[in-house]
């Protein structure tokens, strides 16, 4: 199985687009909402976005703002729920593009004994919101 995990916080501008980007290429999506207070408006925003896409919020966590160590812990805790599955780890402003279907990449990895795939970050969103070649 292929799962997506994202930890979203103070800005939900790209979240709907990001979740839509991955929705058809993963089996399950885990959205962790990182809040600075229990009254943080982000929870309402994320709830509306995920509801529109028929995705459940996996977890909410109230933490000090911008604690990147804690964000990493939240990613890792979530991945431990299904330790034998493949995971796409993506912030809400990251849209991974692969050279071939992700299932084929995973098959190649499993055949060759690889446990993970890394890649480079490249900002390539065009004026119309598409990914130019």
Q: Where do the protein language model's features map onto the residues?
A:
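Short, well-formed alpha-helical segments that are part of the catalytic scaffolds
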Residues: 11-25
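Conserved donor-nucleotide/metal-binding helix-loop-beta segment in metal-dependent transferases, i.e.
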Residues: 98-126
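A short acidic, amphipathic alpha-helical/loop segment
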Residues: 17-21, 45, 101-105
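Acceptor/aglycone-binding surface of glycosyltransferases and processive sugar-polymer synthases
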Residues: 126-133
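Residue-level recognition of beta-strand->loop/alpha-helix junctions
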Residues: 33, 59-61, 118-121
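Active-site-proximal specificity loops/subdomain of glycosyltransferases
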Residues: 38-90, 97
